[in-house]
Amino acid sequence: MRIKSFKSRAFALVSTTALLATLVVASPAHAAATGPTCDGATPVQTCTGTTSDGAAYKMMVPATFAGTVTIWSHGFGGNTTIPGVFAVDSSAQLAPNGPGQNGGSPDLIKYLTDKGVAVMGSGFSTQGWNLDEAVKTNAELIGIFKAKFTTTTKVVAWGYSMGGGITQAFAEQHPELISSAAVMNPVDAWGSQSKYFIDLLWLMKTWFDPSIKLTGYAAGAAGDMQMLGDLQKYTAILTALKAGVASGAWPTTSSASGKALQAGGIPSRSALLMIGRLAGISAQSSSFDGIVGPPGAAATAWPLAYAPALATLENIAGVLGYSLLGARDMQNKMGGTSFDNQKTDYSKQLSDEDRTVYNAAFSGNTAIAGMLQTLSPLNPDAPRIKGDAAALAKSASTMYESTGKIKVPTVMMIGQHDPVEPAGIVQRISDLYEEDFAAAKAAAKKAAQKSGAYSAPARKLQVLWSVTPKSWSKFDADGAPISIVGTPGTGHTNFTMAQYKLVIDTAIAAAANGELPWTGAQLSKVTKAKGLKIDRDTLYPWMKYYNK
């Protein structure tokens, strides 16, 4: 996603009144399409313009253009500018960014144009949850490109995070416009992704700070200030939980139910882990592998009691801002609260496997039962979210819900422990595709009984899992954990340029040949890119939304 990391210190430097005065809320632009205006430069010319929704676009076309163009969809961006914190960015994006980059990695763009491949992308007319708007923009942009560059033969769609979801939705709705797709750590359909976000936020509010508003924000800048106030409170919760991991102390802002659990001897780390398991957040993170512990007496207790909670904490910190901004953005878009958990049975969201594997970290069966009991809809201290009927109806009738169907040759890449888009999103797509592929094979065999010739169906999905090392946690001389950034297979959109090149090369090859490469040469390229694995036997849990 595109927004920068939230920095809590930024809020302390600006008064509420001053911040309110400087908030800028972006609205979708609407205008006639313009361009493309091209500079005619060589060896690569640049063309710019806007689609009919006002979205800025950019194209870079080499003089050696051989007919293939990529269309990039960028990740999540906020719709509100807050000076010093984050800004609305509607500039055109052409490819994944490297550290500190915007608009697309120059190295990656050159890598493609040197091959005779053109690149294009949009900034989109609105940010936030913009899947539906982006799909329309991309369809129009492809038409503009083909009209200008009439020798175009292949279009390859790709994107990550929000853009990964956009690319998957585009491939589902407009397979006739593209030849292949590269989908990286995609958001799930809004129904599923929003449940993941809101479950996390509601559970933290319910146990750790019931003064958090979360829903019913005011319109405009005043509501943005309320959301920022909530963000400060969530950040304070994480700070308190980190400080209390060893002692088990709960945040002082905890609800009556939370304080009762504390009085019953349940440490805050057990509640923190419970929130993670109920929402579906990984218990392994960039710093915590859940395997290696500090030397000495804590070595046994560490992986059982402490590491899962600390990993959950680190992952929550990674997804918190996206969750809150996503919830706020959708409230603006739908005109009210479009999430409802009045009928959710959270006890059913705790799997039998989690009850067993994390039993010690949960502080035992009695503690598990006690924590789940406080989440009952009958508990007045845990008020549920009641969605606004009109907002729920608008969401259901206007938001496209991705099916996960694979309609064009598609390569996917995702980290095992991405905190924003869990691996279960791609696992579900992979599982559904295996069912479709099995049905296609059965149909081919049946047809062969009549024709006498068997024509095997081609696999249309190749999943590249970004995997972790066998272990990676580190500790200082005092046994304190050392923070680690960028561990492969963890974090959000944590990919290397070599991996991006492999993914887009795979998609381009699929576009050229009509099917994905499964040769030994392809497997060698996967190995050479490092940290990736093709595995059709993975069993990552689906998002909780599908537990029906």
What kind of region is each of these model predictions?
Residues 2-31:
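Secretory targeting and sorting signals
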Residues 32-160, 165-548:
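C-terminal His-loop and adjacent cap/lid subdomain of alpha/beta-hydrolase
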